[in-house]
């Protein structure tokens, strides 16, 4: 299938009375003879070249984005079969003319079947062409007729519109001139009255807005000035009052602290004096008692 796909699109230069023809235009016998020669040349090349030829053909044929997956699978199967046949020719059966002949005939048979199938499809397409041509011609006639009708209708409408427009313009110009004069007089009077009323209203609104703005500005300025004056006065008064209060509080606190300190000092001095007096008295009494005791003992001893 892969090979027939290529034969459909390739022109083969065949020496037939010095004329170049497409292989698909030849008779069945001529096609078979040419293909047998081609396959015979293929099976005589080396195994390395066969592998590269099959690989390159597979890459080109299987990378065609215009076919579906089913067609690609069929191509792959055909390439696989052709590759296996080529490998046998390159192996031990290279000189086996009988096997070569039968294998060549098998390959050519597959190719010829594909070509005949393509020819049938092309014949069917050619037979269906007149029907399509007639159908397309009728469709085009209807389409062109509709377009021409629409086009003529548009042109007629535009032409009539232009003529009517010119007539209407002349009539309208006269009416417009008359209406303009009347409207000018009426509009002058109305505009004068309206402008007077509008100007009065606008002036009143502007005066009211200016009054409000001035009142707000004056209020803000007065508030700021009063606040500053009141702050200064309050600061001075508060400072004086706080100084006097702090002085009085400080004097009272100091007097209380002095009294407390005096009481504490008196108590401490009394305790210290008592302790000192006790110690002194004890020492003096001890000394006196010792002296008295010694004198008494001396007297008793002498009396004995």
UniProtKB/Swiss-Prot annotation:
Q: Where is the composition biased (Basic and acidic residues)?
A: 142-159
- Keywords annotated in UniProt: Cell membrane, Glycoprotein, Malaria, Membrane, Repeat
Sequence segments annotated as region (Disordered): 142-304
Task: Say if the entry is tagged with keyword Membrane.
Answer: yes
Organism domain of life: Eukaryota
Q: How does it sit in the membrane?
A: Peripheral membrane protein
Q: Which GO terms describe its cellular component?
A: plasma membrane
Leader sequence range is none
Location in the cell: Cell membrane
Q: What is this protein called?
A: Ring-infected erythrocyte surface antigen
Specify the species.
Answer: Plasmodium falciparum (isolate Palo Alto / Uganda)
The gene name reads RESA
